[in-house]
Amino acid sequence: MNSLSLLLFCIFFVFSTFAKKVYYEAENGKLDGVTVYKSDLTGFSGTGYVGRFENPGNSVTVTVEVPQTGMYDLTIVYCANMGQKINSLTVNGQSAGDITFTENTKFEDLNVGAIYLNKGKNTIGLVSSWGWMWVDAFVINDAPNAAKDVTSKLNPTLINPKAIPAAKKLYDFLKTNYGKRILSGQVGAAGQAGDEGQEIQRIQKATGKLPAVWNMDFIFESNDCTWRPQNPDITEMAINWWKKYQGKGIMSAQWHWNIAGKTGDFAFYKKDTTFSIDNAVTEGTWEYEKIIKDIDRVAGHIKKLQAVNMPLIWRPLHENDGDWFWWGNNPKSCAKLWKILYERMVNYHGLNNLIWLWNGKNDANTPVDYIDIIGVDIYANDHGPQTTAYNTHFDFYGGKKMVVLSENGRIPDIQQCVDQNAWWGYFQTWNSEFILQDSYHTDAQLKEYFTHKTVMNMDELPSFNVNSYEYQSGNNNNNSSNNNNNNNSSECFSIPLGYPCCKGNTVVYTDNDGDWGVENNEWCGIGNSSSAVVCWSEALGYPCCVSSSDVYYTDNDGEWGVENGDWCGII
């Protein structure tokens, strides 16, 4: 193990130490609606810079050449002296995500993160969305990055130490499959839960599958709403769905929080309501009292879900990095409102079935200690893997939080996600035309994505309706390491080497230190090598069965089972 760790370190050291930066000047690229400038601004490289991206679709594209396929760090040298701007990055003609350019007064480097480039020539472009900025150069390293480790630093437990067993099991399930599988997901009709209407019907007809992750929206459940579904109400719908599938499904929820100010009608769009988030997070105001009553109402619904052991991936205050919702584009007040929601729901109402998903701005105000999972909403013009967006969010949290596509228009190409290490925990396509119209998804595309070997659908899920469950690793302290040292050091040689002891005894590697296994995506030492059981199927390219498995086939090698849609050796 020591030699293996040293080898990995040396590889990373070589890449990071000797990679050189190569500049590709914007003024030498292909220009569409932008102009080359050579004065006004100073501090640029080359012979000039380009701007101003005045109209949607204006772009600059450069051709770069790399020695091998891989992930390459990209830096854009820019000036945004007309205010903060958001514009779109393309790589080889595909959308790679939106880039936020912070306001400045001179040319500065913006590290965009890693992008996937093929061996040989590739194109990198910037396309106007908000426009009105200047670009000097695109800069990449001349050697690819080492592969990103997406699992080893994940928080081992939920942030709520009182989480119910069903929520613990769901989180462990998501964590265990993160970096290996991508779960399918779909949004149904507004105000519905477990809705098997036209969206689900289209998927099932085209693919023969049901999504792993379903969605509900408390859009009509605030006190100001004058209409909401009845008989059944939204909670009854969710419970009926939970019972129908015997707990073998995952439900997510957002809350388009309709609310009225002192004048005007209720709404969730900022332009349609006079309600103030700044006042709402100030105790003693009528706005504060109003949000507490709304939270209490929704909490009453979620309590009914908890009563039947139903966990919920909870996504309130979604898309708060934008300015279209009344809670958006106000980082300090939004973070404060998030904490009010958490304290009221968890500590006051005792809602311990929630997995808290943050879908918004990443900055110094982000309430990191109140977040389990990170969600990103992307409505791209193509089926690109959105690797840049994935890396930006994953890196901000230091690899401690899973990142999912909490909303998408087009499903990202699954194989490209795998190739580019964009391990979205799940995708969740919006309803209506985004899943119904061929302009977004053809039947062939849906079948390709839902039946891809990496994608997990509802038929592969276990039941999460459990009354007892302990985390597979860690404890209820997200600041601790992922090590699960259940065996004492006198029994396990790996403890002094910085690795936990294995709970099981399946050998996947042996060196001078002893026998090693892998549990929870981490090396672990097998304490009593005399009792070790060799995973014979590893040598044949197949894992050993993790749980007890029915025998599907027997040959000269041994008995075979099936887990997660793949053969596994029974030991």
Swiss-Prot record:
Residues 165-459 form the GH26 domain. It catalyses: Random hydrolysis of (1->4)-beta-D-mannosidic linkages in mannans, galactomannans and glucomannans. GO terms for molecular function: carbohydrate binding; mannan endo-1,4-beta-mannosidase activity. Residues 491-527, 534-571 form the CBM10 domain. Belongs to the glycosyl hydrolase 26 family. PANTHER family: GH26 DOMAIN-CONTAINING PROTEIN-RELATED (PTHR40079:SF4), MANNAN ENDO-1,4-BETA-MANNOSIDASE E-RELATED (PTHR40079). This is Mannan endo-1,4-beta-mannosidase B. The lineage of its organism: Eukaryota, Fungi, Fungi incertae sedis, Chytridiomycota, Chytridiomycota incertae sedis. The gene is MANB.
